[in-house]
């Protein structure tokens, strides 16, 4: 009877459940976020690019992460320079487009005024063109600048998305403890005793 009571009162350990790997769970969540349709705006597209970079970090092993970090760090400087160049081009094209439209409006209002229309028409006839021809040329130039600016903006958004992706990969890889090859080499060399790295030290008797 006493043995039965001791068996009933003895504590029992809870059943062991299989642990869910955190890396696989995070990878599944990121893959679902990347595959959840197309981004509605530019912010969501950049966010999906960051999710894609995070997915790559979890998939890659330590050596692959180290190599990708080095390549991404080298390419980031060039991509930032290209982004700034595209940004300046877009601004200049926008200013040119506004200038053409302002000239078209000014020329149109000038031709509508009876006091200055005759003077302007006579001045244009001396060079063999009319006010309508100048207006058409300026309008066509404004349309061309607008189309070219649209292509530049598209390229600019693509470069920005690549920058976000590479910066996210580098940041997450560093948080996971991955070091760049150059940093690792510097730390190993600094930890060696004096004269051991070069191999050219002289032995004293």
Swiss-Prot record:
Residues 177-205 are annotated as: Disordered. May play a role in the release of virions from infected cells. The gene is Segment-10. Residues 196-205 have a biased composition (Gly residues). It holds the Pfam family Orbi_NS3. This is Non-structural protein NS3. The lineage of its organism: Viruses, Riboviria, Orthornavirae, Duplornaviricota, Resentoviricetes. Signal peptide: none annotated. InterPro entries: Orbi_NS3 (IPR002565). It comes from the Viruses. Belongs to the orbivirus NS3 family. Coiled coil: none annotated.
């Amino acid at each position: 009877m006493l043995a039965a009571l001791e068996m009933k009162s003895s504590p029992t350990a809870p059943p062991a459940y299989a642990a869910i790997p955190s890396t696989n769970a995070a990878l599944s969540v990121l893959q679902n976020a990347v595959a959840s349709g197309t981004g509605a705006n530019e912010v969501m597209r950049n966010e999906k690019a960051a999710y894609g970079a995070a997915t790559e970090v979890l998939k890659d092993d330590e050596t692959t992460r180290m190599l990708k970090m080095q390549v991404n760090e080298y390419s980031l400087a060039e991509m930032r320079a290209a982004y700034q160049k595209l940004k300046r081009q877009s601004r200049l094209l926008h200013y040119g487009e506004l200038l053409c439209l302002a000239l078209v409006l000014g020329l149109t209002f000038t031709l509508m005024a009876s006091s200055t229309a005759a003077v302007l028409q006579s001045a244009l006839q001396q060079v063999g063109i009319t006010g309508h021809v100048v207006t058409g040329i300026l309008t066509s130039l404004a349309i061309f600048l607008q189309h070219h600016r649209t292509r530049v903006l598209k390229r600019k958004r693509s470069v920005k998305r690549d920058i976000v992706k590479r910066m996210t990969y580098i940041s997450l890889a560093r948080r996971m403890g991955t070091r760049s090859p150059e940093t690792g080499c510097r730390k190993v060399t600094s930890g060696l005793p004096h004269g051991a790295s070069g191999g050219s030290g002289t032995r004293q008797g």
